[in-house]
């Protein structure tokens, strides 16, 4: 009898709402967690050029505590410190990230800062000599995170992040599985709020990775093969349509492809 390949598969649970008015489920999700002090993290463009922050505030009502609206590209360390300080001062018990890669990974580190209450430098992965990197065990509870995507990104369902230093030094890397999102939103209006150029650039990254993964499909187990094949199919069909500012379906499909890529790992 021919030997049967052995493999293991582990996945984290996440709730997901997609489509028209998907964001309307935000209040129900916050209520499910009994969250009373929701704090939003987003960038200046989302806060000033889209109605998303006002929409989230209206949906949450009294559960809305405040927002940090100055998160910059690549999640600078100083911005994350400021966001964590504001969230702590407002007693945040739920973090809502509105944006794409930079904001999503920054919010994870905000959660780490709130939970551990130590200098971020002490919580980062350490590299020494030629040995393997060592990630500190971050055991304290973390506030739950909701991710509201404005563009497709594989950062949507991760537990790690890297922050940029203001002095240009090595990035600070963090990992805590408790910072994986509880809920993800692919709301059509939120996704259409991003300019087509951003949708295309992020989508191209998702497609390129899907293409590379599909080329190595024979080495993968059956579950990974399925994820890779469908991620490639979704991204290949969505990519040519991302430039349409009125068509949300390819943006949703690209988000799905990016999520499947996470499950591939």
Can you annotate each of these PLM segments?
Residues 1-94:
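ATP/NTP phosphate-donor binding region
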Residues 15, 37-39, 66, 93-96, ...:
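Structural motif
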Residues 41-44, 98-100, 243:
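Glycine-rich beta-strand-to-loop/alpha-helix junction loops that act as flexible
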Residues 52-56, 83-84, 103-116, 158-161:
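Short Gly/Thr/Asp-enriched flexible loops that form oxyanion-binding sites at enzyme active sites
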Residues 92-110, 150-156:
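Glycine/serine-rich anion-binding loops at beta->alpha junctions
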Residues 116-223:
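A glycine/threonine-rich phosphate-anchoring loop and its flanking beta-alpha core
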Residues 213-265:
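Active-site segments that bind and position negatively charged phosphate/pyrophosphate groups
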